[in-house]
Regions:
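PLP-dependent class I/II
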Residues: 1-171
Length: 171
C-alpha cells in the first residue's frame, strides 16, 4: 500500500472514530520509495492507529516470539486513552519476554545486528526473485516478491495444489 493510499485510510479512521491495527512485521522488506515503513509517516495516524512490530520476519525470531506494539498516547476510544489501558492490561497479564530473548532483540538494533538483518532480508528477497523468475520462465503468471518475500500464482484449473506442487518438484 502506498503512503497516499494509507493516508486515505488514516483520514477515514479519524473521520469515523475507528482504530487501525497496522501490521508492520515486514517493514524491513520494503524497497519501494512510496511505501511507508510505519503508519506514523501518515498525518494524523497517532490519533487512530496501533502498530504491531515483530522480530520474526526481519531477524529470524520466528520460534522465540519477540515483538512490540506501538500505541500512541494520543490515541483514544470513547474518551479512554488506549495506551494507559493497554499498559494496565499488559502489566497484569504478561511478565515479559525471557531475558535472553530481550537481549537478542537488543542485539538486532546494534550495528552488527542491523548488518546481519539486512543480509538476511536480502537473502530472502533474492530467493523470491529466483522463484518468480523460474515460474515466469515456465509460463506462469506470478505476482509478489516486492516489499515481502512471498510469491503468488494461480494453479492450473485442472490440478489440485498438491498435484501442482508435485509438478513443480518434478519439472
Amino acid at each position: 500500500i502506498t503512503k497516499d493510499q494509507l493516508q486515505e485510510w488514516v483520514d477515514y479512521a479519524n473521520k469515523v472514530g475507528a482504530v487501525i491495527i497496522y501490521d508492520a512485521a515486514y517493514e524491513a522488506y520494503i524497497s519501494e520509495d512510496n511505501v511507508p515503513h510505519t503508519i506514523y509517516e501518515c498525518d494524523g495516524a497517532k490519533t487512530c492507529a496501533i502498530e504491531l512490530r515483530s522480530f520474526s520476519k526481519n531477524a529470524g525470531f520466528t520460534g522465540t516470539r519477540l515483538g512490540f506494539t506501538v500505541i500512541p498516547k494520543e490515541l483514544e476510544s470513547n474518551g479512554t486513552k488506549l495506551n494507559a489501558l493497554w499498559a494496565r492490561r499488559h502489566g497484569t497479564k504478561f511478565n515479559g519476554a525471557p531475558y535472553i530473548i530481550q537481549r537478542a532483540g537488543e542485539a538486532v538494533y546494534s550495528e552488527e545486528g542491523k548488518k546481519q538483518t539486512k543480509a538476511q532480508v536480502a537473502y530472502y528477497m533474492n530467493n523470491a526473485k529466483v522463484i518468480m523468475d523460474g515460474l515466469k520462465n515456465a509460463g506462469f503468471s506470478v505476482s509478489g516478491g516486492v516489499n515481502a518475500p512471498y510469491v503468488w500464482l494461480e494453479t492450473p484449473k485442472d490440478m489440485t495444489s498438491w498435484e501442482f506442487f508435485d509438478y513443480l518438484l518434478n519439472n
